[in-house]
């Protein structure tokens, strides 16, 4: 892996929204062995519990209610992930008939033609796929399974942007696998461990971003597993950003932009911009400048309780031509920002608000934070292979501290 390559970079995705109601889901199955049903027929999602065992960095995944609804997403338009999805679904239908398989509407139509035979243990029972509008899928998912690379995980998790994310089981079938510890060949063994409450998970934090336009009193809220970054896009002008931390002015920077990353995202855009590599077990928020004009603006690692506010400024209080600043959350473009607009970035679980630094919305207040006794399940719990998946990742995928010695090149005469 090279310095300018961005890990965890999501591929371009196009979301498909169904306008069909739950009583008239009209999809062409294309196969007599497949039956497609509306996801609204399923019960609502059931949350898992996570217990910290002694002498472990991971948390045990415990199902208080039996696992029933599994949402599977894959890297689009690749034969390998399509074949893997059909194989995985067939295994679930044959070995776990009580498990319901949920897919996106376009995926249901795509793969339904690949089921060429009935179930071996029950020839009279067809393969059943549940699908429907995106929000209905979110409301009924117990477990998220991804088949692809890191971009597939980011896409799948983004569906649960402002809700609780289900446990994530990721199989590496893409170009990057920093977040995907399992080879697909292990899918039978791994799923058996998950459904029988014998799997362990690594907890990854999320950032919460509030975008406030200067002419509005409310904000738009999004969540990031990797990073949030402001950048100038295709504008020839550098951005001017006023940065505040916990209500205290930090600096005004003139730069291409700035990236705010989770420890998970420390190996993505932030790393390419010169930021540190941080273990996902470290509670922190990374602030990394992108090509700043001042060489003294170095990357920062802030406490996870920090409340970061960034306001779009202008040079000499004059608005330059085409001074639009781009905002991206996990690689997905958001609304453009102009002079006077602001973003507020905190950890998903909240922050300690100092007087005068409250968020522009009333969803969270200082009293709510202080008086809350019930812990909130936040972040993302990813099924892990070993205690040291992260160390394996930076060694095998990043080539951490690799030698620059050239290997002998073979010739035709060798």
UniProtKB/Swiss-Prot annotation:
Q: Which reaction does it catalyse?
A: NADH + ATP = ADP + NADPH + H(+)
The family database entries (Gene3D superfamilies) matched by this protein are listed as: Probable inorganic polyphosphate/atp-NAD kinase, domain 1 (3.40.50.10330), Probable inorganic polyphosphate/atp-NAD kinase, domain 2 (2.60.200.30)
Q: Which residues cross the membrane?
A: none
Q: Where in the cell is it found?
A: Mitochondrion matrix
Q: SUPFAM superfamilies per the record?
A: NAD kinase/diacylglycerol kinase-like (SSF111331)
What would be an example GO MF term here? NADH kinase activity
Activity sensitivity to pH: Optimum pH is 8.5.
Q: Which GO terms describe its biological process?
A: cellular response to oxidative stress; iron-sulfur cluster assembly; NAD metabolic process; NADP biosynthetic process
Q: What is its main location?
A: mitochondrion
What is any one of the record's Gene Ontology cellular component terms? mitochondrion
Q: Which cysteines are joined by disulfide bonds?
A: none
The UniProt keyword set, sorted, is: ATP-binding, Kinase, Mitochondrion, NAD, NADP, Nucleotide-binding, Transferase, Transit peptide
EC number(s) per entry? 2.7.1.86
User: Where along the sequence do coiled-coil regions lie?
Assistant: none
Which one Pfam family would you cite for this protein?
Answer: NAD_kinase_C
UniProt key word Repeat: no
Aminoacyl-tRNA synthetase among the record's keywords? no
As given in the record, the signal peptide range reads none
Q: What else does UniProt say about it?
A: Present with 4650 molecules/cell in log phase SD medium.
The UniProt entry's sequence similarity note says:
Belongs to the NAD kinase family.
Q: Which PANTHER family match?
A: NAD KINASE, NADH KINASE POS5, MITOCHONDRIAL
The free-text function statement in the UniProt record for this protein reads: Phosphorylates both NADH and NAD(+), with a twofold preference for NADH. Anti-oxidant factor and key source of the cellular reductant NADPH.
Record protein name field: NADH kinase POS5, mitochondrial
Organism, per UniProt? Saccharomyces cerevisiae (strain ATCC 204508 / S288c) (Baker's yeast)
